[in-house]
Amino acid sequence: MDLVKNHLMYAVREEVEILKEQIRELVEKNSQLERENTLLKTLASPEQLEKFQSRLSPEEPAPETPEAPEAPGGSAV
């Protein structure tokens, strides 16, 4: 019985370490994405932010076909 218990404890410890590493990676990735999001918000024009916010509002359905992204400066070329 001790052999089974020891094996299970070892397997659980191993799995916990794997999960801890995955959590560390996900936290790091989340922080990176949050920094990127903040940077993009600061670089976006008020018109771009308004357009983005309108796409997120639940009253209006999102367009089925993606639009071409606008070039910096506000006009699509």
Curated annotation (Swiss-Prot):
Induction description: By glucocorticoids in lymphoid cells and upon IL4, IL10, IL13 or glucocorticoid treatment in monocyte/macrophage cells. Transiently induced by IL2 deprivation in T-cells. Expression is up-regulated by synthetic glucocorticoid dexamethasone in differentiating myoblasts.
Primary site of residence: cytoplasm
Chain positions covered by the region annotation Disordered: 41-77
Localization per record: Cytoplasm; Nucleus
Intrachain S-S bonds: none
Residue ranges, compositional bias (Low complexity): 68-77
Keywords, comma-separated and alphabetical: Acetylation, Cytoplasm, Nucleus, Phosphoprotein
Positions of the UniProt region annotated as Leucine-zipper: 19-40
Record text about domains: The leucine-zipper is involved in homodimerization.
Description of how the protein assembles with itself and partners: Can form homodimers, however it is likely to function as a monomer. Interacts with AP1 and NFKB1. Interacts with MYOD1. Interacts with HDAC1; this interaction affects HDAC1 activity on MYOG promoter and thus inhibits MYOD1 transcriptional activity.
Protein name, UniProt field: TSC22 domain family protein 3
Native species: Sus scrofa (Pig)
